[in-house]
Amino acid sequence: MRVLVQRVSSAAVTVEGAVVGAIRPDAQGLLAFVGVTHSDDRDKARRLAEKLWKLRILADERSASDVGAPILVVSQFTLYADTAKGRRPSWNAAAPAAVAEPLVTEFAAALQGLGADVQTGVFGANMQVELVNDGPVTVLLEL
């Protein structure tokens, strides 16, 4: 499982013209793109959620748990792109939707269980993601 996390001052996910999840402007938070591979399980999802919740990448070396920062979770199978051969990425390392969707849901639920204010995109949808990257700070978490 991979989580590409960006510190943001605002972010929004839109599906079919409607905003489905957002971090309001000037409310420093985290945008977490979540990719799932075949060997991932619920335990990995929970451990990565805890790692993200306590990751000290906000202002003054604080974590989302320290300041109650909002987290926007967006599924992102392309985090498992293989570009080693040719010019067209392979997605073979990405888990199929039947495996990935429950694990992305588990990841978001684990964050909520830790006390996070979590919003999400829509799994499998064509999403438009807008964000203002703060710093910029972008970190790849992987288990």
Curated annotation (Swiss-Prot):
Keywords from the UniProt entry: Cytoplasm, Hydrolase, RNA-binding, tRNA-binding
Catalytic activity: glycyl-tRNA(Ala) + H2O = tRNA(Ala) + glycine + H(+); a D-aminoacyl-tRNA + H2O = a tRNA + a D-alpha-amino acid + H(+)
UniProt key word Hydrolase: yes
GO cellular component: cytoplasm
Primary location recorded for the protein, binned into one broad class: cytoplasm
An MF annotation (GO) of this entry: Gly-tRNA(Ala) deacylase activity
UniProt entry tagged with the keyword RNA-binding: yes
Pfam families: Tyr_Deacylase
Motif (Gly-cisPro motif, important for rejection of L-amino acids): 135-136
InterPro entries, A to Z: Daa-tRNA_deacyls_DTD (IPR003732), DTD-like_sf (IPR023509)
GO biological process, one term: D-amino acid catabolic process
UniProt record similarity statement: Belongs to the DTD family.
Annotated protein name in UniProt: D-aminoacyl-tRNA deacylase
Source species of the chain: Mycobacterium avium (strain 104)
This protein's encoding gene: dtd
